[in-house]
Design a protein with these regions (language model features):
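Short, low-complexity Ser/Thr-rich regulatory SLiMs
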Residues: 16, 53-54, 106-108
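Short beta-strand scaffold segments in enzyme catalytic cores
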Residues: 25-28, 50-52, 102-105
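Short loop segments at secondary-structure junctions
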Residues: 29-33, 55, 84-87, 109
């Protein structure tokens, strides 16, 4: 017996206005168990698939092989989908993530990302 699943997947070409150019990412506004998210990302076979749980705006990114801590182009893609299809009256979304709060602003059809500052450490040579 085949088990069916139904959900929307948005394919976005980040950093481009042209289809089939830029940096592709898949975006899914639905929460799944970790194993299911990994399977979906593997099936998509893109560098990253972003999963966003709209109950708490929690975003996670999966490559075909594993979960990753942060992905800029997939976050940009998720913000684009949010502003265009989820809440087109909004100009700000704050994603919660394992890397902290990630803010996306939309102004004049341009999306800006504000990521947390990384704390660099000096390493010995």
């Amino acid at each position: 017996m085949i088990k069916k699943m139904k959900f929307d997947i948005f394919y976005v070409d980040a950093f481009s206005k042209e289809v089939f150019s830029g940096n592709p990412a898949a975006v899914i506004f639905k929460h799944f168990e970790d194993e299911k998210m990994q399977s979906i990302a593997s099936e998509n076979n893109l560098s990253e698939t972003a999963f966003i749980d709209l109950e708490n705006n929690y975003i996670r990114w999966f490559s075909p092989k594993c979960e990753v801590d942060l992905c800029g182009h997939a976050t940009l893609a998720a913000a684009h989908v949010f502003f265009e299809y989820i809440d087109n009256n909004s100009s700000l979304i704050t994603f919660n993530s394992n890397s902290g709060e990630l803010k996306a602003y939309k102004k004049d059809s341009i999306i800006y990302l504000d990521f947390p500052k990384d704390n660099f450490k000096q390493v010995d040579e």
